[in-house]
């Protein structure tokens, strides 16, 4: 089976947005107009094609990023649907890792909201070219020009406006196309599938001319010859203008801005045209970078069917009919059904079936090519973020980074039968979602699950009950505190055990230093002259790492520190890897005891949107929760309050906020950083948790 479209006609993109910016509805309309979906599914009726997990249909929020393939203007579009709720930033992060371009959707009333800023920064991190789609212009209070200003003020981006809305709120009926200088009007009776062109309305002619001039000025900056011609009075034609806008978008010089109302079926075809015109193809992206595992040298793969095979597994899902599916982005080479691959873990994996996914239906395929996003069935060892590559020419692509969980709770199975099922369920869920961790409390024997927020854990517990039929008692959520060394310390620690026969001996000299926040655990080996044989060094690192993970003060992990191993001693007979591991464990405990431990807590960035009359109450309440107000800002007839608040003081906040604002305020919150717990609170915690 040959490739259906040449690589330059591929567009791998995602739609990223705040929770209610209409992302799923936009994807639905794209599937409808590209001919894949014959009945439009509305999110608020719980029928959207992309939202295929039961919990998503009930809650009306997108949780898992399903990948879908469709076609437009003889181009092949692979769309990755990303969730907008803050507890699922991990899903967005892994989608961005495998996308070539992104459409940022904004609510036409609110403009750029806090979660939009987070996702935008994630896209900056991966260097993803993007464009903006200002949606919901049919809503009361929608203001396109205000939204464009928020793109400048809150994201620091340079907007290149391509379309202006005709009419606003309930009068919104079409767009002014600035590139082709015409108006586009949609026919409501055809569900937006039909539209016609007409002249730009007379009352918008001046505004259209002003915005078109701005657009041309931005575009000609991309090319000296075009700039010279423009300065001499020659305007670029539509084709030249598009080429210049494409060049600038791919170079991150500006972001094209479109608008519409997906719900009212206006503007989606213009969005699809812009994806084809301005979003990158896999050939516009730099070669994917990695490391050759045989030599440890940097290596790369060109985007080509002829290059050795390389791919990244970016999502694992359990499908009720096929079993475990590994969603994979192929960067180079080709893949056939039944072929063997090498995974990062140096294990051979056989590809059972290869599926092209439409939101919840699937098509079996025999071959896949560079640039494709496919689901593979039958992989046993591969987890999220792993590289798959050809056996003869291995490469390890850069791994994804996953944030540490900030909240935890205990789960106890109700019966013996549930216990076995729960083990299987939790392992499967953890394989799907790297920001979800499972551990056992050594003292109580309880199973502890950890995640990125209350909703995150609530949905996972819900899935455990529904998909795996596990009945369990769930404890109250607890904050995931961390411990941190108060100062640097130099240690000389010996472990010695002589009791007849072979003894145990290990001695290490180390400098243990607290690191920058977020630096993690760093181990440096500077042993000279073989004072400790090389084969024992990994055991020493393991001893420090594992002891730090169990904590010292009240049993929370010690984070962000460096261990510099500079000297030590060993015994020809009595030394072993185990002896040095035990020695390192003792040294870590001694370091914690002598350096002293500070307690750290997760601090959340909270944004509350409230009507003016409740502003005082909202600020007073945040202050009472040990919060620090960062600023307030007027949004239409409401106020947006931004604050940093300890997670420990945010449990149950939603109910209290609703009660004192009569349900008129809403908020969003996401993890920002760890900070030291004040002394009086730390004392209370020690008494409670010790």
From Swiss-Prot:
GTP binds at residues 17-24, 81-85, 135-138. Keywords: Cytoplasm, Elongation factor, GTP-binding, Nucleotide-binding, Protein biosynthesis. One of its GO terms (biological process) is ribosome disassembly. InterPro entries: EF-G-like_DII (IPR053905), EFG_II (IPR041095), EFG_III (IPR009022), EFG_III/V (IPR035647), EFG_IV (IPR047872), EFG_V (IPR035649), EFG_V-like (IPR000640), G_TR_CS (IPR031157). Residues 8-283 form the tr-type G domain. SUPFAM superfamilies: EF-G C-terminal domain-like (SSF54980), P-loop containing nucleoside triphosphate hydrolases (SSF52540), Ribosomal protein S5 domain 2-like (SSF54211), Translation proteins (SSF50447). GO terms for cellular component: cytoplasm. It is found in: Cytoplasm. Gene3D superfamilies: 3.30.230.10, 3.30.70.240, Elongation Factor G (Translational Gtpase), domain 3, P-loop containing nucleotide triphosphate hydrolases, Translation factors. SMART domains: EFG_C, EFG_IV. GO terms for molecular function: GTP binding; GTPase activity; translation elongation factor activity. Catalyzes the GTP-dependent ribosomal translocation step during translation elongation. During this step, the ribosome changes from the pre-translocational (PRE) to the post-translocational (POST) state as the newly formed A-site-bound peptidyl-tRNA and P-site-bound deacylated tRNA move to the P and E sites, respectively. Catalyzes the coordinated movement of the two tRNA molecules, the mRNA and conformational changes in the ribosome. HAMAP family: EF_G_EF_2_B. Belongs to the TRAFAC class translation factor GTPase superfamily. Classic translation factor GTPase family. EF-G/EF-2 subfamily. This is Elongation factor G. It comes from Novosphingobium aromaticivorans (strain ATCC 700278 / DSM 12444 / CCUG 56034 / CIP 105152 / NBRC 16084 / F199). The gene is fusA.
């Amino acid at each position: 089976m040959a490739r259906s479209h040449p690589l330059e006609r591929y567009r791998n993109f995602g739609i990223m947005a705040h929770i209610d910016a209409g992302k799923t509805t936009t994807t639905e309309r794209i599937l409808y107009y590209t001919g894949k979906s014959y009945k439009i599914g509305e999110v608020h009726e719980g029928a959207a094609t992309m939202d295929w997990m039961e919990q998503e249909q009930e809650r009306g929020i997108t949780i898992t990023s399903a990948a879908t393939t469709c076609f437009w203007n003889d181009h092949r579009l692979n769309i990755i649907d990303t969730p907008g709720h803050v507890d699922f930033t991990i899903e967005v992060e892994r989608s961005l890792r495998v996308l070539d371009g992104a459409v940022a959707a904004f609510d036409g009333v609110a403009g750029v909201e806090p979660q939009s800023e987070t996702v935008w920064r994630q896209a900056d991190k991966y260097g993803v070219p993007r464009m903006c789609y200002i949606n919901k212009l049919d809503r009361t209070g929608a203001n396109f020009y205000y939204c464009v200003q928020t793109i400048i003020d809150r994201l620091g981006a340079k907007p290149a406006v391509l379309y202006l809305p005709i009419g606003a709120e309930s009068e919104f009926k079409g767009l002014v196309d600035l590139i082709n200088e015409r108006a586009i009007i949609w026919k409501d009776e055809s569900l937006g599938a039909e539209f016609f062109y007409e002249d730009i309305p007379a009352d918008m002619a001046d505004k259209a001319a002003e915005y078109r001039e701005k657009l041309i000025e931005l575009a000609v900056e991309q090319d000296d010859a075009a700039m010279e011609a423009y300065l001499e009075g020659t305007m670029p034609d539509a084709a030249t203008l598009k080429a210049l806008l494409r060049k600038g978008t791919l170079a991150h010089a500006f972001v094209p801005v479109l608008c519409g109302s997906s719900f009212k079926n206006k503007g989606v075809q213009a969005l699809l045209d812009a994806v084809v015109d301005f979003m990158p193809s896999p050939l516009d992206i730099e070669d994917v970078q990695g490391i050759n595992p045989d030599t440890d040298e940097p290596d790369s793969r060109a985007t080509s069917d002829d290059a050795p095979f390389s791919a990244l597994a970016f999502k694992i899902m359990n499908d009720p009919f096929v079993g475990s599916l590994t969603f994979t982005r192929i960067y180079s080479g080709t893949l056939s059904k039944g072929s063997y691959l090498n995974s990062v873990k140096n294990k051979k994996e056989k590809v059972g079936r290869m599926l092209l996914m439409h939101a919840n239906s699937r098509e079996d395929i025999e071959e896949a090519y560079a640039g494709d996003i496919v689901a593979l069935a039958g992989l046993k060892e591969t987890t999220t973020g792993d590289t798959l590559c050809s056996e003869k020419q291995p490469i390890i692509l850069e791994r994804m980074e996953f944030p540490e969980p900030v909240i935890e709770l205990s789960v106890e199975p109700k019966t013996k039968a549930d216990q076995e099922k729960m083990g299987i369920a939790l392992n499967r869920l953890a394989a799907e979602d790297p920001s979800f961790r499972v551990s056992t409390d050594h003292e109580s024997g309880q199973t502890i699950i950890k995640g990125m927020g209350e909703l995150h854990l609530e949905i996972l517990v819900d899935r455990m009950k529904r998909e795996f039929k596990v009945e369990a008692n769930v404890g109250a959520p607890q904050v995931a505190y961390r411990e941190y060394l108060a100062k640097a310390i130099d240690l000389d620690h010996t472990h010695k055990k002589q009791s007849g026969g072979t003894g145990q001996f290990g001695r290490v000299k180390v400098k243990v230093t607290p690191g920058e926040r977020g630096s993690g655990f760093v181990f440096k080996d500077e042993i000279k002259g073989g004072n400790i044989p090389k084969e024992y060094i990994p055991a020493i690192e393991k001893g420090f790492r594992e002891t730090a993970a169990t904590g010292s003060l009240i049993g929370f992990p010690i984070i962000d520190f460096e261990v510099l191993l500079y000297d030590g001693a060993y015994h020809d007979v009595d030394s072993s890897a185990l002896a040095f591991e035990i020695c390192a464990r003792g040294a870590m405990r001694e370091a914690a005891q002598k350096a002293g431990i500070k307690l750290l807590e997760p601090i959340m960035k909270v944004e509350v949107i409230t009507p003016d009359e409740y502003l005082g109450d909202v600020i007073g309440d945040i202050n009472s929760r040990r919060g620090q107000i960062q600023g307030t800002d007027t949004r239409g007839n409401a106020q947006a309050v931004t604050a940093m608040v300890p997670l420990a003081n945010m449990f149950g906040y939603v109910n209290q906020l609703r009660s004192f604002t009569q349900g008129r305020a809403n908020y969003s919150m996401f993890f920002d950083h760890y900070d030291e717990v004040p002394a009086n609170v730390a004392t209370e915690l020690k008494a409670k948790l010790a």
